[in-house]
Structures are given as C-alpha cells and as structure tokens.
Amino acid sequence: MSEQEVTYTTLRFHKSSGLQNPVRPEETQRPRDVGHRECSVPWKFIVIVLGILCFLLLLTVAVLVIHIFRDGQEKHEQEKTLNNLRQEYQVMKNDSSLMEEMLRNKSSECKALNDSLHYLNREQNRCLRKTKIVLDCSQNKGKQVEGYWFCCGMKCYYFIMDDKKWNGCKQICQDYNLTLLKTNDEDELKFLKSQLQRNTYWISLTHHKSKEESQQIGDRPSKLDSAARNSVPNRQKCAYLSSFSTEEDDCARTHGCICEKRLNKFPIPGSCAKGRTQSALQRDEDES
C-alpha cells in the first residue's frame, strides 16, 4: 500500500499542479496590451494638440511677417511721397521768390516809367502853356490861312488847318520861312500825334512806286508801313501824319500841313499873330 500511495501522491501532485496552474500566453500578454493601450492614447492627443499649436504659431508668424513687410513698403512709399512733396515745396518756394523778385523789379520799372511820364507831361504842359498860340494869318494874295503853333524844346511846330496838296504845303511853309516837318524821331512823332487837332497832316516824305524807295528832304530815311506804299499804284506818294500812325497817300490829295523851325529863328510870319504882337512873340522866344 505504501507503494501505491507514493505513486498516487506522485500522480496527484503532477495532476493537481497541472490543473491548478494553467498558463496561457494570451493571459500573460493581456495586461501588457491594456497598459500599452492606456499609455498610447494620451500621447496621440498631446501630439495633435501640439501640431495644432505649431500650425497656429506658424500662421501667426506668417501674418506678422506679411504685416511687417507691408508696413515697410507703405513706410517707404510715404517717405518717397514726403520727399517729393518737399522737393515740390522747395521748387514752389524758389518760384515764389523769383516771382516776388520779378514783381519788385516790375514795380520799380513801373514807378520809374510813371515818374518819367509825369515828368514828360509836366514838361509838355509847361511848353504848351508858354508858347501855344492860335494864329490867323493872311497871305499877300488875300487868302486866309488858319493854323496854330507851339514850341517845345528847341523846335516850334506850325499846324496849318487848310487842306492842301503836298506841294502846296511845302510852298506855304517856304512862304513863312519854315520847312515842312521832317523827322525820324519816334518820341517826337508820338508827341506830335498827341497834339493833333484834326485827322491828317502832310510831312516831308515822298515815295516813287517805280523806284520802290523813300526820299525825305534832309537825306534822312523814314519808317513807313510797306502796305501803305502799295495803296496807290504808279503814282508819286507822300507821307502824312495821323493821330494813329505815319502813312502814305497820293501827293495830289489834300491834307493839312505841319511846318517846323528851330527857336534860334522864331517862326513869325510877318505880323499875323492873332492877339499877340511880333515883339511879344520875340520875348517868348528869348525867355524860352
């Protein structure tokens, strides 16, 4: 019996040990898989969150870079515009200075011209107040000649109101020991134009169409409008003075006359001065 018990015990030991402690690979690996699964889920969530944060950070950096670049461009454009405005302002300032300088110069010139004009007006009025006299003369033939004369400076001008041909004006000036007006002085012509009491007066200038040249008594050329020379074809032309210009006309037509003489020999035709004696006029000559 002892041998059976030993054998039984041995079998029972081996059997009980095999039944009570069954070892399975799945059971030994299950706790590890659960622990691994429990640990992997939080790390995935953290990675996703970190990725989103990195994306947002990169997006923010990109937006900031774009804004900084755009602000830099706008600042550069503003500085460029500001420099252009400064240059334009400087140019306008220089132009304004030049305009002010020109205005001052023009004002000075205008003032000088006004002073000269006032002086000439005073001198002109002084001359006219001293010497202007209306004459009513009669020639030896009994024909009455109306006119007036005045002196200014060293010249006296005798205006004959009767209409005569150019040769007639030349002759009547010679009868009074005068000469038909001959001048090339623009200032003198302007002065005489301002004193005209009628439209036109002959002066000492003739022009022949065939020769296309001007001839003036005293061998002095005169400036005339070339268009006026063509107004009367193939006829001798003579110059006349109007209140507007110096022009030419047919010498056979009639205009008034302007005679002249210098003060060293006063132009008194006999004793035909109306309201004045020859001695009184001579005293005027001496005083002038």
UniProtKB/Swiss-Prot annotation:
Gene: Klra2
Stretches in topological domain Cytoplasmic: 1-45
Superkingdom assignment: Eukaryota
InterPro entries (UniProt xref): C-type_lectin-like, C-type_lectin-like/link_sf, CTDL_fold, Ly49_N, Mouse_KLRs, NKR-like_CTLD
MF terms in GO: carbohydrate binding
Limits of the C-type lectin domain: 144-263
Residue ranges that the UniProt entry lists as topological domain Extracellular: 67-288
Cysteine disulfide partners in this protein: C151-C156, C169-C257, C173-C259, C238-C251
Function: Receptor on natural killer (NK) cells for class I MHC.
Known glycosylation sites: N94, N105, N114, N177
Keywords of the record: Cell adhesion, Disulfide bond, Glycoprotein, Lectin, Membrane, Receptor, Signal-anchor, Transmembrane, Transmembrane helix
Localisation: Membrane
Residue stretches spanning the membrane: 46-66
GO biological process, one term: cell adhesion
Its membrane topology: Single-pass type II membrane protein
Protein name: Killer cell lectin-like receptor 2
One GO cellular component term noted in the UniProt record for this chain: plasma membrane
Main location: membrane
Record note on quaternary structure: Homodimer; disulfide-linked.
